[in-house]
Amino acid sequence: KKKHIPVYRWLIPVTAVAAASLLFVFWLNNQAYDTIHSADVQEFVSAANTPEKHIELITATGTKIKVDEKATVAYAQDGSLLIDEKKIATRQSTGEGEEEHPMNQIIVPMGKHIKLQLSDGSQLDINSGTKVVYPQKFKKEYREIFVEGEIFIDVTHKESNIPFIVKTSLFTVNVLGTAFNVKAYKEDTKAEVVLVRGK
């Protein structure tokens, strides 16, 4: 049985009126993006075995780091990884090309959950049984992550003019500054997106 993060309990469906007022910043699309290659990312996700007892962070070089559920995990603006405010050595971004924006993955097993701050300041609450793939440092044109499982994300308003894209195997969400919940477990036939706050 999946363990849900308490914050999810007060999430409510968006009304038709609210949804209509948010269409210009929030839309759902079944079409693939040309940014993150879904097939490649899904292969990356599938290749990583889910640990049974601990949260695992996999760097672009393949290094596996065990992370405590209560640890503070954050990425600085330059892509540096800090765990409990201690800098962890990783491959750094050196340019604007696809290969120069190394991808990391965090895997949360059943019965665990964790919070993570992305390089732009956006906050993730990652639920149990979830895998998230994300760049150490976002590109200038867009911000994009891939999710298999369930997360609550509070997108920072600092870069509200830059699209934030959440991809799953079933759909894509494109927002600006907003907060929402995404549920897209691999074994489930139905996926959900619940908008909590937006412009």
PLM regions: where:
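Single-pass transmembrane signal-anchor helices and their membrane-water interface zones
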Residues: K1-K3, V7-A39
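Short, small/hydrophobic-biased targeting/export segments
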Residues: D40-G79, I88-R91, E96-K199
